[in-house]
Amino acid sequence: STERIMPVVPLFHANGWSIGYTAPITGASMIMPGRDMSPKALYEMLEHGATVTAAVPTVWLSLLDFLEKENLTLSTLKRVVIGGSACPRAVIEKFQYKYGIKVLHAWGMTEMSPLGTICSFKPEVFALSKEEQLNVQETTGHPPFSVDLKITNDQGTDLPWDGLSPGKLWARGAAVVKRYLKSGSDIADDNDWFDTGDVATIDSNGYMRITDRSKDVIKSGGEWISSIDLENAAVGHPDVSEAAAIGVAHPKWDERPIVVVVCHSSKKPEKMDILNFISKNVAKWQVPDDVIYMDEIPHTATGKISKIDLRKKLSDMNYVHPESK
């Protein structure tokens, strides 16, 4: 009853309607946002006493940028739940170390009703250093009771939980979908495993990390490159407010990554400055070949980056890889 929760995502989104039920069940009050999702509007709504809020990373990137520019703080907020896509480390660090707000990373899908993992600390994590705990917070957490996860290669062979081997992520549980309404056939396999469409690793403690969506993984010269790793590395640059990495056709390597960035309004770093910054966090061969500047990256209705619309936008610009010209 002491909590006031503000779900930022729309109520048609899995996280939106789940909070709409769980908040009153626990006795918490709610702040219901309107259509204006601008950083200024979000800040003003949060200042109505919100203690907990939840949204996708892109929402918090824009809010943090606004807070910094306006020299503002969040007076009542205690916890931020982040899901929908991978959360950049820079967002976690800024919330926790600059504003004293705890970040809770989670993952789920409508097909999972919706929770799949939650990044609460297991006892062994409390003994780790602050840096090691941040590494854990970057994962999407471990599955709750009744949810099972596994990762496999393309041939369906189970992969080890070593935190290093990426594979197709499968989920199974009492609240995991078997078929869509009126579809007529099961979408889960014979053992009730549901293909989430994500690529992930799972470590020995059961903490899962999304490395990409299957459709967004960049395949260059037969090797996989995670667009999420590139995006998180780019957003760590102090002059970059948002980033999206995609693969574009290349005459030799089939695909090569490029990164599209939105910069803070007053600053626009050189391309090599951004690429050199990214190279500190990824292998040399994974560093994007080009940087494209945009005023805005397309988003879906729930605030996630829309790679489909972004590719169309680049096509409309007649963009091709520099080595394909």
Residue ranges and their predicted role:
Residues 314-325:
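Acidic/polar alpha-helix N-cap and adjacent early helical turns
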Residues 143-170, 204-205, 267-271, 306:
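Conserved beta-loop-beta connector loops within the AMP-binding
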Residues 100, 132-137, 157, 162, ...:
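Conserved ANL (AMP-binding/adenylate-forming) active-site segment centered on the GW(Y/F)…HTG consensus within
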Residues 1-4, 12-52, 66:
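Conserved AMP-binding/adenylation subdomain of ANL enzymes
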Residues 84, 108, 141, 173, ...:
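Active-site glycine-centered loops adjacent to acidic/histidine catalytic or metal-binding residues
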Residues 53, 173, 178-179, 199-286, ...:
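AMP-binding/adenylate-forming catalytic core of the ANL superfamily
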Residues 25, 50-55, 64-135, 148, ...:
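Gly/Ser/Thr-rich phosphate-binding loop
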Residues 8-13, 85:
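Conserved AMP-binding
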